[in-house]
Regions:
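Catalytic-loop of the protein kinase fold
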Residues: 143-159
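Conserved activation segment of eukaryotic-like protein kinases, specifically the C-terminal portion
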Residues: 181-195
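Activation segment signature within eukaryotic-like protein kinase domains
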Residues: 131-132
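Conserved short submotifs of the Hanks-type protein kinase catalytic core
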Residues: 94-110
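ATP-binding glycine-rich loop module of kinase domains
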Residues: 39-65
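Interaction modules related to DNA damage response and DNA replication/repair
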Residues: 278-371
């Protein structure tokens, strides 16, 4: 950290191992993982500016090694910020070592900058879905190679030509085993509330952060862990809300890595949640009901279903076979309604056979005349 605490001066020229020279033009940002400067790469034999870049003095040698490694690993990917140079140099009478990462200058800023703009109110769902697919494509490659980013938040997701690019790999980790990536550095606001219960960083935690990012992109405001309970109130297609719900699920049918999350976001729209004829009888069927019914209360329907030989479940499970969906889904009563519908959509996507029937079909199955 000592190198990061010793600021570079405006006008100072630093030289990398390859001989490239960089002039410091001003400070951009500073935090716990390093200090960032706006800079210019100069010509070899003059002070002519060849390219405007970003210079980051890392907080530690470990952070520097990690970020340089990730830059090489993901070189050439449009969806990440390009690393153009990495080197260490010593300055001052005490020879303080600075660990430097040079990256492309992202002139359009970050998603965090968009959030700070009062005129920005988010993107249309189609655009959000497209950008998420691209980010998840990168995470699919990273997770398959044992790499986790660990700090996906609005200020670390940049824009280039209006498209998202993942940056700041300062605390990313490369591990050969799932237990090899300790849970040591993270931003609490973008982590599950029960994060202290986990000893190691799982790939699903990266997906959790992408789920929060999706909410930010849809609404134009910074979503943190405190906002997860409001996901079903988002103005977005049901399949996208379902994806976000499972991406941010602390347990249950969450997406374990980039591969699973990418597959889900591309296939949830094809899941048919419309009413079907369903089974010929409710006998031995495991039934979940959701919504506000005209025929009676859910307790009254429970009795009718059980009289018809069915088993009523309070939540969707591995053996659920029927979902009874009311014409009116009341989003103001409890949190179960959203969870049941989202869970059924995801389970159907994974291949579980669940019949979705409406109130009229239920009435016929229990021997009532529809209201």
């Amino acid at each position: 950290m000592a190198g990061a605490r010793q600021p570079l001066r405006v006008g100072q020229i630093i030289t990398g191992d390859t001989g490239h020279r960089y002039r410091i033009d001003g400070a951009l940002d500073g935090g716990g993982f390093g200090v960032v400067y706006r800079a210019a790469r100069l010509a070899q034999t003059s002070d002519r500016v060849v390219r405007h870049v970003c210079v980051k003095v890392c907080a530690s040698a470990a952070d520097w090694h990690g970020e340089a490694h990730m830059g090489n690993l993901l070189a050439g990917r449009r969806e990440v910020v390009e690393i153009v140079d990495a080197f260490a140099f010593g300055t001052g009478s005490r020879g303080v070592t600075r660990y430097v990462i040079v990256s492309e200058l992202m002139r359009e800023g970050t998603v965090g900058d968009l959030v700070d703009d009062p005129e920005w109110h988010g993107w249309p769902p189609a655009r959000v879905r497209r950008e998420l697919r691209d980010l998840l494509g990168v995470l699919k490659l990273m997770h398959a190679a044992g790499v986790t980013h660990r700090d996906i938040k609005p200020t670390n997701v940049f824009l280039r030509d209006g498209r998202l690019a993942l940056g700041d790999f300062g605390i990313a980790k490369h591990s050969l085993t799932p237990g090899g990536s300790s849970l040591d550095a993270y931003t609490p606001a973008y982590m599950p509330a029960d994060v202290d219960q986990y000893r190691h960083w799982g790939t699903w935690l990266d997906i959790y952060q992408v789920g929060l990012l999706a909410c930010t992109l849809l609404t134009g405001r910074d979503w943190t862990n405190d906002d997860v309970s409001r996901i079903r109130d988002l103005t977005a297609p049901d399949d996208l809300k379902c994806w976000i719900w499972h991406a941010t699920a602390a347990r249950g049918l969450r997406y374990v890595d980039g591969t699973a999350a990418l597959e889900a976001i591309g296939s949830l729209r094809a899941v048919d949640m419309g009413g079907t004829r369903g089974p010929a009888s409710l006998r031995d069927q495991r039934v979940v009901v959701t919504g506000r019914f005209e025929t009676g209360t859910q307790d009254e329907l429970r009795d009718l279903i059980e009289d018809a030989g069915g088993v009523v479940q309070s939540a969707v499970s591995d053996d659920t076979s029927v979902l009874v969906r009311a014409h009116q889904i009341d989003n103001t009563v409890g949190g179960f309604e959203g969870r049941k519908l989202f869970s059924v959509r995801e389970r159907k996507r994974r291949g579980q056979t669940i019949h979705v029937i409406d109130e009229h079909r239920l009435c016929r199955l229990v021997g009532l005349s529809p209201v």
